[in-house]
Amino acid sequence: MYILHIEHPVPSFEGWKKAFDSDPVGREKMGVRHYKILRPTDNPNYVMINLEFNTEQEAEALLAAMKVVWGRVEGTIMTNPKSQIVEVVETKDY
């Protein structure tokens, strides 16, 4: 399993969430199996998103699509996106 981790500041969480929910790249069609949106408890205007994929290639394809979207919206609903694709090596639930 692979996770595309994205994080960035947002001027308004509500405005960003509306744009996220519009799903401009078609997350499910691009292979996203599951996602989580996280926010630091001390900063509601910063978001982290973990998108889970079966393959690294799916994660890379979504990241490429997001870079196009970011080029259109950076400075309006978000700024300075950082991203990384990671492989899940081990998980355990307690």
Region roles according to the model:
Residues 12-35, 67-71:
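Short amphipathic alpha-helical segments
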Residues 21-24, 28, 43, 54, ...:
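Amphipathic alpha-helical interaction segments
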Residues 2-9, 36-65:
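Short, well-ordered beta-strand segments in beta-rich or mixed alpha/beta enzyme
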Residues 12-14, 55-57, 89:
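Residues that cap or initiate secondary-structure elements
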Residues 62, 68, 85:
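Extended interaction regions within the primary functional domain
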Residues 2, 30-48, 71-94:
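Glycine-rich beta-strand-turn "strand-cap" elements at beta-sheet edges
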